């Protein structure tokens, strides 16, 4: 049974093609014009609804169908990227056409043009020919030879002082860095104007301040020892052997350590299988004791050493231990003692013009003496005659203070009166009269400092020296 062959279905034209032909004729189906012009019900809902709702430029409800600012990207494709590389703009190249008569070999060496500097050459003037132009045709292939005469050029140079090189100073001659020497520099002038004498710089040195000719690099600051960091343990050593023989504090007497230099780093071997006991427990597990350092502290001079301990050792051979700062104070600076100063009695005094009475001076003088020296030891009556003459020998004691702790200036003192009562003579001498006697004090005068007048009477504890003198008549 033969199958009936179906008729081929004719494809309908697209809405855009139908819109182009039927719009003018007015025969478009009712669904073509709204679809092409975007006036369908769905698009009108989006168009009027987007007036009250803003979707951030995503292209929703705009009715344009463009996909927003970025547009629609087909699935499975990548957006186009700019692959153009930027390069500097080069000037255009001019290509000269090659004629049939040009040589086939092009020389790559460019011709060098020479420009002669100097005075311009004179160009001779040719008078015009009145008869007209003469044309000469020649088939000779010999190159033309032009005779050019050498031109003599004269160049005159004027020196401008503004652009003239300055004076060149010769470098100083090398000298040894020792002894007294003097460096001086001479001047070479290359100008032709007036010369002005210049001062010569003289550098004189002595052996105490000689500097080397080698340039000195930039000086680096002194590195800090790091003795008082947070990771360093501080241990104070009291034993003075830490300064002279520090090995006695770490190991017992070993002949191998005799005669070593204590100013260098000391290394000590450690045995993992045994326990090393140090004489001083502060130096337990020490494997290295570095060089000493003297530092100045507020309390005095300090002798310091850095020690490394080996408390733990891993299988790989790495040692783990603390870093210890051992220090020994060599001296201490005690605070300054405060000495109370006493006021010294001034040695200057004021002298008044009026003389003091003997009684007032004697009262102040005898106040500072002992009671035993104030009264007279003895009084002997002297026979006298009615003629008011006094005779006799009167022994007496008096005290004169000599120099003590202070320098006492000498001033004139009062006369010492001797009170003797007149007695009636029991016997009348045969001699009608006797000569008068004069009392001479066998001692020198002394001066009492005015500052002692106001002192109260003191008994004992006298800082003066006393001596006895006798009065002879």
Swiss-Prot record:
Listed GO MF terms: DNA binding; structural molecule activity
Keywords: Capsid protein, Cytoplasmic inwards viral transport, Disulfide bond, DNA-binding, Host endosome, Host Golgi apparatus, Host nucleus, Host-virus interaction, Late protein, Microtubular inwards viral transport, Phosphoprotein, Viral penetration into host nucleus, Virion, Virus entry into host cell
Entry PTM: Highly phosphorylated.
Impact when changing residue 457 to R: Complete loss of host Golgi localization
Main location: virion
Disulfide-bond pairs as recorded: 22-28
GO BP: any one term: microtubule-dependent intracellular transport of viral material towards nucleus
Subunit structure and binding partners: Interacts with major capsid protein L1. Interacts with E2; this interaction inhibits E2 transcriptional activity but not the DNA replication function E2. Interacts with host GADD45GIP1. Interacts with host HSPA8; this interaction is required for L2 nuclear translocation. Interacts with host importins KPNB2 and KPNB3. Forms a complex with importin alpha2-beta1 heterodimers via interaction with the importin alpha2 adapter. Interacts with host DYNLT1; this interaction is essential for virus intracellular transport during entry.
Family: Belongs to the papillomaviridae L2 protein family.
Miscellaneous note of the record: HPV16, in comparison to HPV types 6 and 11, is more often associated with malignant genital cancers in humans.
Function noted in UniProt: Minor protein of the capsid that localizes along the inner surface of the virion, within the central cavities beneath the L1 pentamers. Plays a role in capsid stabilization through interaction with the major capsid protein L1. Once the virion enters the host cell, L2 escorts the genomic DNA into the nucleus by promoting escape from the endosomal compartments and traffic through the host Golgi network.
Protein name listed in UniProt: Minor capsid protein L2
Taxon lineage: Viruses, Monodnaviria, Shotokuvirae, Cossaviricota, Papovaviricetes
The encoding gene: L2
């Amino acid at each position: 049974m033969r199958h009936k062959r179906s008729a081929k279905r004719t494809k309908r034209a697209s809405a855009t093609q139908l819109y182009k032909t039927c719009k003018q004729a007015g025969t478009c189906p009712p669904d073509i014009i709204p679809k092409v012009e975007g006036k369908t019900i769905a698009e009108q809902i989006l168009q009027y609804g987007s007036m009250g709702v803003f979707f951030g430029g995503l292209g929703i409800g705009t009715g344009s169908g463009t996909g927003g600012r970025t547009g629609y990207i087909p699935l499975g494709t990548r957006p186009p990227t700019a692959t153009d590389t930027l390069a500097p703009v080069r000037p255009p190249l001019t290509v000269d056409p090659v004629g049939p008569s040009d040589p086939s070999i092009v020389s790559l060496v460019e011709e060098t043009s020479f420009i002669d500097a100097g005075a311009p050459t004179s160009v001779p003037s040719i008078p015009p020919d009145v008869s007209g132009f003469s044309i000469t045709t020649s088939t000779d292939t010999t190159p033309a030879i032009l005779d050019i005469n050498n031109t003599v050029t004269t160049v005159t140079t004027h020196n401008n002082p503004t652009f003239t090189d300055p004076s060149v100073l010769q470098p100083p001659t090398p000298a040894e860095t020792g002894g007294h020497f003097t460096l001086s520099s001479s001047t070479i002038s290359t100008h032709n104007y007036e010369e002005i004498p210049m001062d010569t710089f003289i550098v004189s040195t002595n052996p105490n301040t000689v500097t080397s000719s080698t340039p000195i690099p930039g000086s680096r600051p002194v590195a800090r020892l790091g003795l008082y960091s947070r990771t360093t343990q501080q241990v104070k050593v009291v034993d003075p052997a830490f300064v002279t023989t520090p090995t006695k504090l770490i190991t017992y007497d070993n002949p191998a350590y005799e005669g070593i230099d204590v100013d260098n780093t000391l290394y000590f071997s450690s045995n993992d299988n045994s326990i090393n006991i140090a004489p001083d427990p502060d130096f337990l597990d020490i494997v290295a004791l570095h060089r000493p350092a003297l530092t100045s502290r507020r309390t005095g001079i300090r002798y310091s050493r850095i020690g490394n301990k080996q408390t733990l050792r891993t299988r790989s051979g790495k040692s783990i231990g603390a870093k210890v700062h051992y220090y020994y104070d060599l001296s201490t600076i005690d605070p300054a003692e405060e000495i109370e100063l006493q006021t010294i009695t001034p040695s200057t005094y004021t002298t008044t013009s009026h003389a003091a009475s003997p009684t007032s001076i004697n009262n102040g003088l005898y106040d500072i003496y002992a009671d035993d020296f104030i009264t007279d030891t003895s009084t002997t009556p002297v026979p006298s005659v009615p003629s008011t003459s006094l005779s006799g020998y009167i022994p007496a004691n008096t005290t004169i203070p000599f120099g003590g702790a202070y320098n006492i200036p000498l001033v004139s003192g009062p006369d010492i009166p001797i009170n003797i009562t007149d007695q009636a003579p029991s016997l009348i001498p045969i001699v009608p009269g006797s000569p008068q006697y004069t009392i001479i004090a066998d001692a020198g005068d002394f001066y009492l400092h005015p500052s002692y007048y106001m002192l109260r009477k003191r008994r004992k504890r006298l800082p003066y020296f006393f001596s006895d003198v006798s009065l002879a008549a």
